[in-house]
Structure formats: C-alpha cells, structure tokens
Amino acid sequence: MTDQGIVKINASLRKNVGTGPSRALRLSGEIPAVIYGKGRDSLSISLSNREFVSKYRSAALSTHLIELEIDNKKEYVLMRDVQKHPVTDRIQHVDFQFIDYGTEIKIEVPLIFTNEQKCIGIKRGGVLNILHRTLSIKCSPKAILQNIEIDLSGLTTGHSIHVSDLKLPPEVNVTMKEHNPAIVTISSASTEKEAESNQESTSTTPSSES
C-alpha cells in the first residue's frame, strides 16, 4: 500500500464518553469522534482540533483514505459524518468507518468541470446546465478517486455528457440509481427562454373553480 491519496491524522483512545466528557474534550482543544464498522466494536477516540480542522479544510476528506494513528496503532478509515455547532460552525463530533481492504466501498466523488471558457456551445450562446455535481461509485479502498474531471471544451449546443462518456478506471463502478444519466448539457438560449416562459404562464394561470 502506498501513501498516495492517504491523509494521516493522529488520534487518542478515550475512556470517558457522554455529554459531559465530550464537552470537556472540546474545551481542552480536542474533538470527540467514533470509529464504527461491520463486525467490529466501535472505538471512541479524540482528535486534535487544530490538526483535524487544518486537514479538513485543505483536503476533501470524504474522498480520501485516512490513516488514523491511535496511540501508536494504525487504523484505515473513511470519514462518514462531521457534526458542527449550529451557531459557531465549530466541529463538534466526527464519525469514521473502519475499512477492510478486501471489501469494496461506496462513496460520492465530486465532479470538476474544466475548460468552461473554451466550451464551443457556450461561445455560441448556449446555456450550461450542470445536472450532477457528484458521482456515486463503488470501488476498492485502493482505487478511491478524489474527484473526476469533465472537460467541457468540445461540448456543443444541444448535446450532453453522460456517465457512459466518462473514462473511469476499470475497478471503479458507478452505482447511481438512474441508468446512464446526463451529467451536463448545453441548451440554446431560446430553449431556456421558452422553458422559463412556459413556467411563468403555468404559475400565473388561475385554477378553475368547481
């Protein structure tokens, strides 16, 4: 296993759980967290607020394999949930999932759209419609994708890029419910105006009384 795409974070086991101990942890500059997974007992841990927030802001942790060093023992996990304070937006709790290298995992991968300024359809007055900003995939932990780039430069008016048009590694499988959905389209400006006009006329048409 290589270090490519792996984010390393230090952690410590915590014996005391519950509202009181968790509040005390936060006051001391720590974040309470838990690791869970099928067939394994959950682990209650704590993270350095400074270290975790720094890496949380600099990397898309939800699509990175994370190496937690817990009191000199390594565990490989995925971040599954981050709970934040509703007012201060400070991180209150983090959920991780144990990773088994022999089992495929499901994740949502961000889609990155490039060359919008070079897009033929937009240059000709077309309107860009992004229908999906993430892609649901299933793959081994070693094949996790941090993002998927989609080149818009060759997209013309009236055409779309579908899931089947993406060049994905053979070990990555798409798990979206809809079969081969369009991800992005370029429609003509007149089509957009007509659609808006139809919506306005529908919303302003009085309903008939019985």
Swiss-Prot record:
Biased composition (Low complexity): 198-210
SUPFAM superfamilies: Ribosomal protein L25-like
Top-level taxon: Bacteria
Annotated source species: Ehrlichia chaffeensis (strain ATCC CRL-10679 / Arkansas)
GO terms for MF: 5S rRNA binding; structural constituent of ribosome
Family: Belongs to the bacterial ribosomal protein bL25 family. CTC subfamily.
Function: This is one of the proteins that binds to the 5S RNA in the ribosome where it forms part of the central protuberance.
Protein name: Large ribosomal subunit protein bL25
CDD domains: Ribosomal_L25_TL5_CTC
Keywords carried by this UniProt record: Ribonucleoprotein, Ribosomal protein, RNA-binding, rRNA-binding
Gene name as annotated: rplY
Classification via PANTHER family: RIBOSOMAL PROTEIN L25/GLN-TRNA SYNTHETASE, ANTI-CODON-BINDING DOMAIN-CONTAINING PROTEIN, RIBOSOMAL PROTEIN L25_GLN-TRNA SYNTHETASE, ANTI-CODON-BINDING DOMAIN-CONTAINING PROTEIN
